[in-house]
Amino acid sequence: MRIVIDTNVLISGVFFGGFPRKILSSVVTGEMTACATAEIVNEYEAVVQEMIDRKQGHISKNILTPLITALEIIEPVTQVDICRDPDDNKFLSCAKDSRSLYIVSGDKDLLVIEKFENIQILTAKEFCEKYLSL
């Protein structure tokens, strides 16, 4: 199964646990494939660094290494312009170009779309309840 993980799900999984962490663990263990572009990976790294700085450095940026290593990095070719927050179009483009079936997000600007072509947009809880054994 191929998915795209929105940055807020990644942050929740890394720093807070719960359903987002179950998804990240499933990617790291190879149970599913998470796809990203270089732009998305850069955003992951920048936001994690911001969180580390806020927590005064008690967590190493290396916490992302297992996930980044497990990601399938793709080169986007499709331009998508349907999200009310233009910065989120990169997740739709990545999902389309990687032939992912799901975007896992907590972002209302993405969740309101619900489905883009054959790609479902689900919360981490919805995704876990439907596709991961809890």
Question: Could you describe each region identified by the protein language model?
Answer:
Residues T69-Y102, K108:
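Active-site neighborhoods of divalent-metal-dependent phosphate/nucleic-acid chemistry enzymes
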Residues M1-G18:
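Metal-dependent nucleic-acid phosphoesterase active-site entry motif
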Residues I11-G13, D53, T78-R84:
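Short, flexible loop segments at the rims of nucleotide/cofactor-binding pockets, characterized by
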Residues E31-A34, R99-L101, I119:
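Short active-site oxyanion
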Residues D6-T7, A36-T37, G106-D107, T123:
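A secondary-structure boundary/capping signal
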Residues I5, R21-Q49:
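PIN/NYN-family metal-dependent endoribonuclease catalytic core
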Residues G18, C35, H58, I82-N89:
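Residues at secondary-structure transition points
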Residues S98, K108-L134:
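Acidic, PIN/NYN-like endoribonuclease modules and their adjacent C-terminal/linker elements
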